[in-house]
Amino acid sequence: MEKSVYRSLLGERSTPFYVFDTQGFIENYQALQAAMQQVYPNYRVAYSYKTNYTPYICNLVKSLGGYAEVVSDMEYRLAKKLGYENSRIVYNGPAKGSCMEEHLRSGGISNVDNPAEAARVAQLAAACPECTIKIGLRINMDLGFVSRFGMSVGSPELTEAINLLHRHENVKIVGLHCHISRNRWLPAWEKRAQIMVDAADRYVDGTPEYISLGSGMFADMDEVLRAQFGQVPTYEEYAQAAMRPFIRRYPQAQPIVFTEPGTTVVARYLSFVTRVLDIKTVHSRTIATLDGSYENLGEICTMKKLPLCHVTAGAGQVYASVDLMGYTCLEQDLMLEGYSGPLCPGDVLAFQNVGGYSIVSKPQFIRPNCAMVAVEPDGTVREIMREETFEDVFSKFVFPEEGQK
């Protein structure tokens, strides 16, 4: 997003706040979808709500034809509130809530993570013999990182889960799911796709209705960030690696193939605007304190240096190395290590690429959470999340009655 956009917003609100780039999100989403569908026409996006469940963003995905991928009753209820049909909601996760049964009775997509969950599905089937319950299985695989989720091919747990489901004629295993976020490289994507094709032949009768490959793709990103990852695959390269096994196996009747992107589609298109409060040197370390926190940026700021836009600058000193620290009383509240350049109190900075696991992970620690605005394709600015208040934070607590204080 251009510096001028951030500057124009400063006249309307105080820092800190988030800025969502609607047009950038749409273009990136469509680029991912087009690359995949060029190779495999029946590809679909199921957007990961846990990554960023801002209703405006989730509804934007809905308007673009995407499915909702949820992992809790809270997220499921959000998708329903936004008007999703159950057939376009994918309910995953290892600890599904009580809405799972309602979702399955209503024709929704859900994937069994463990035998205990399979037993729940079996109980539902017994209690509702007139219902046809379609279910998927979550497959675990070793791609250089062994996830804790799902059940391994050939394992006793997977066999137990399948046996529980097969006891009921009204339960149909129609799909498979996997999710491995720790290996984003092309060989791993080709391998996971082939494993899923082979598992479908083994565990699904006939052509599956769907196979989900989960998430774990690099996104389109700023060059500052790209350089820290090395050779980042393009969407076209991912499409060739991940979709070709399905074209080979299903040349005619094609199941839906999902990926479940979160950071891939949203990370780059949210920025966090914050102000420098103070600069001081403690022993040999120069520290700038900002009115935001590393919690506002998501876990990526603990692993990589985020792209940074110096929105407004005063006549400050030029520093060789300044650690940009947050407002909290935590020693580890480091937003960016080793900033070099001019800086002075009052300067406004925009941290970019903060759309993933930021607002959904930010606690109400010391301060209420800040607002978010969206810049729409025509330039309109819309507030899509207001700043929290004292009442928002404390309304759920029980206070002592007057006279008991």
Task: List each language-model region with its residue ranges.
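Charged (often Lys/Glu-rich) extended helix/loop segments that serve as interaction or gating elements
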Residues: 9-10, 247, 252-405
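Active-site-proximal loop/turn and secondary-structure-junction residues that shape catalytic pockets
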Residues: 51-53, 74-75, 95-97, 114-116, ...
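Short acidic, glycine/serine/threonine-rich loops at helix termini
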Residues: 58, 81, 101-105, 122-124, ...
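A charged N-terminal "starter" segment
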Residues: 1-133, 163-172, 377-405
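Structured core elements
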Residues: 90, 111, 136-138, 177, ...
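Conserved, mostly hydrophobic/aromatic
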Residues: 25, 50, 72, 137, ...
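Active-site loop/helix belt of alpha/beta enzymes
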Residues: 141-275
